C-alpha cells in the first residue's frame, strides 16, 4: 500500500541537544506573553535569535468549514470568536460581505449606529493593546489605567446589545436595536475621558519614560518594503510609513462623509507603532463626536427592506400573515442569495479584515474565506525576530498586536 506524503513542519525534527554554541528553545504556547496559543521555536546563539519558527494551529476550530454548514444568519455569531477583542469588527465585515452578495444596503440610521460601534470597538481594542503591551514590558500601572477606560467602553456595548465581549451587535441588513436613552451622552462622556487620560496619564507615564523608550526604540524594525511583501496592513503597515487605510481608500458606511486623519509613522519600530495607536484613539473619539449629529438627523429605520432575504419588523410579523410566513421560511430554511462571489475588505483595529464568499444559490455558503490581518503579522515574526535579543522577543510580539482567534480560525 502506497504511503501518503506527509507534510511536516520543517522544525519538527530539530535537535534540541546541540554540540555547538546554539540552543533551541520553545517559547509558548503556554507563555503569558505569547498573546494566545503561539509557539515560537527559537534558535539562539547566546542571547541572540538566529532563527525563529512560528508554529500555529493550537486554536484551530474549523470556522471557515463551519460556514459551509450553517445558514448565513446562523454563522454571524461565530465571527465573534475570531478577533474576540473587537468582535463587532468581525460581525460587521461578514455582514457587509453578505449584503454586497445580496445587493442590499443598510438604512441610514443603521449605518450611523454601525459606525459608532466599530469605532467604540477600535478604542476597546487599542486600549487592550496599550495595556497588554505595557504589561509585557513591565509597566504595570499603565495596564490598570487602560483596563479602567476599556471597561467603560465595554459597558457601552453591554448597554446596547447585552454582551460585553462577543457582541453579535450587527445584523445582515442593519442592526437589531436603536440606541438606548442616554447612551449617546454616556458615549460622549467616555470620549472626553479617553482623550483626557491619553494626554495626561498615558503620555505622562510612557511617552518620555526612559525605560519604555529603551525597550521600544529601534526594536522590531520593519521597513516599508518588508511590510508590503509580508502582507501587513493596519497599524503594522502605517507604522512603516505607508499611508493606507481602507476607511479612506475604499470607504464604507459613513467613513466617506467624516473628517478624520490617518496617522502614519516613519520610525518603523515598536515605539513608532505605539505612538500610532495612541493617535488613532484620538481620531476614533473625533469620529464618534461627528456621528452624534448624523444620528439625530436620520430616520428611525434599522433594517433594510428586502422581504426575500430579511424578516419584516416584529410588529408586521405579529399582524400580517404574509410577513409571518416569510419570517418562518427565512428562519427554518435560510435566505438564498443569488449565485456569485464577493470579497469585501474592511479596516479592523488590527488591519485589513475581509470576507470572501462564494454562493451557489443555496442557504449555505459554498465557500467562505476570512482574510485576517493577524495571520500575516504572525508570519512576519520569522523575519523580524532574527538578530534581536531574547529579551526583545516579547516586546516585538506585543507590538504586532496579534490575536490567535483570527490566526488559527
UniProtKB/Swiss-Prot annotation:
Regarding the membrane, this protein is recorded as:
Peripheral membrane protein
- The EC code for this enzyme is 7.1.1.-
Q: Which reaction does it catalyse?
A: a quinone + NADH + 5 H(+)(in) = a quinol + NAD(+) + 4 H(+)(out)
Its annotated compartments are: Cell inner membrane
Please give the Gene3D superfamilies that the UniProt record associates with this protein.
Cytochrome-c3 Hydrogenase, chain B (1.10.645.10)
Q: Tell me the enzyme class.
A: translocase
InterPro entries per the record? NADH_Q_OxRdtase_suD (IPR001135), NDH1_su_D/H (IPR022885), NiFe-Hase_large (IPR029014)
Pfam (any one): Complex1_49kDa
**Swiss-Prot/TrEMBL keywords:** Cell inner membrane, Cell membrane, Membrane, NAD, Quinone, Translocase, Transport, Ubiquinone
GO molecular function per UniProt: NAD binding; NADH:ubiquinone reductase (non-electrogenic) activity; quinone binding
A cellular-component GO term for this protein: plasma membrane
Similarity remark: Belongs to the complex I 49 kDa subunit family.
- For this entry, the protein name equals NADH-quinone oxidoreductase subunit D
Organism per entry: Sulfurovum sp. (strain NBC37-1)
Amino acid at each position: 500500500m502506497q504511503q501518503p506524503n506527509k507534510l511536516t513542519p520543517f522544525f519538527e525534527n530539530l535537535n534540541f541537544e546541540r554540540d555547538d554554541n546554539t540552543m533551541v528553545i520553545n517559547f509558548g504556547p503556554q507563555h503569558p506573553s505569547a498573546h494566545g496559543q503561539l509557539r515560537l521555536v527559537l534558535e539562539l546563539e547566546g542571547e541572540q535569535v538566529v532563527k525563529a519558527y512560528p508554529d500555529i494551529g493550537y486554536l484551530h476550530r474549523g470556522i471557515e468549514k463551519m460556514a459551509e454548514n450553517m445558514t448565513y444568519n446562523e454563522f454571524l455569531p461565530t465571527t465573534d470568536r475570531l478577533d474576540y477583542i473587537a468582535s463587532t469588527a468581525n460581525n460587521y465585515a461578514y455582514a457587509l460581505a453578505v449584503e454586497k452578495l445580496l445587493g442590499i444596503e443598510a438604512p441610514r440610521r443603521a449605518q450611523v449606529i454601525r459606525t459608532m460601534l466599530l469605532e467604540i470597538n477600535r478604542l476597546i481594542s487599542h486600549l487592550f493593546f496599550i495595556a497588554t503591551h505595557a504589561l509585557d514590558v513591565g509597566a504595570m500601572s499603565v495596564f490598570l489605567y487602560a483596563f479602567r477606560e476599556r471597561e467603560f467602553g465595554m459597558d457601552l456595548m453591554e448597554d446596547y446589545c447585552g454582551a460585553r465581549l462577543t457582541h453579535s451587535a450587527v445584523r445582515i441588513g442593519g442592526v437589531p436595536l436603536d440606541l438606548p436613552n442616554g447612551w449617546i451622552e454616556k458615549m460622549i462622556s467616555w470620549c472626553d475621558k479617553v482623550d483626557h487620560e491619553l494626554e495626561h496619564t498615558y503620555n505622562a507615564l510612557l511617552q518620555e519614560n526612559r525605560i519604555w523608550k529603551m525597550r521600544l526604540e529601534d526594536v522590531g524594525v520593519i521597513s516599508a518594503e518588508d511590510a508590503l511583501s509580508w502582507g501587513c496592513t493596519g497599524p503594522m503597515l502605517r507604522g512603516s510609513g505607508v499611508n493606507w487605510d481602507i476607511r479612506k481608500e475604499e470607504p464604507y458606511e459613513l467613513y466617506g462623509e467624516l473628517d478624520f486623519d490617518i496617522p502614519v509613522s516613519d520610525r518603523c519600530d515598536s515605539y513608532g507603532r505605539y505612538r500610532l495607536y495612541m493617535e488613532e484613539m484620538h481620531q476614533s473619539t473625533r469620529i464618534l463626536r461627528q456621528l452624534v449629529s448624523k444620528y439625530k438627523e436620520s430616520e428611525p429605520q434599522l433594517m433594510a427592506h428586502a422581504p426575500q432575504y430579511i424578516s419584516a419588523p416584529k410588529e408586521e410579523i405579529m399582524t400580517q400573515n404574509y410577513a409571518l410566513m416569510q419570517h418562518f421560511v427565512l428562519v427554518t430554511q435560510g435566505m438564498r442569495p443569488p449565485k456569485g462571489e464577493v470579497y469585501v475588505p474592511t479596516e479592523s483595529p488590527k488591519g485589513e479584515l475581509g470576507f470572501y464568499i462564494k454562493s451557489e444559490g443555496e442557504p449555505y455558503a459554498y465557500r467562505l474565506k476570512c482574510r485576517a490581518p493577524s495571520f500575516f503579522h504572525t508570519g512576519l515574526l520569522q523575519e523580524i525576530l532574527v538578530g534581536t535579543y531574547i529579551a526583545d522577543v516579547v516586546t516585538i510580539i506585543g507590538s504586532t498586536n496579534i490575536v490567535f482567534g483570527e490566526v488559527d480560525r
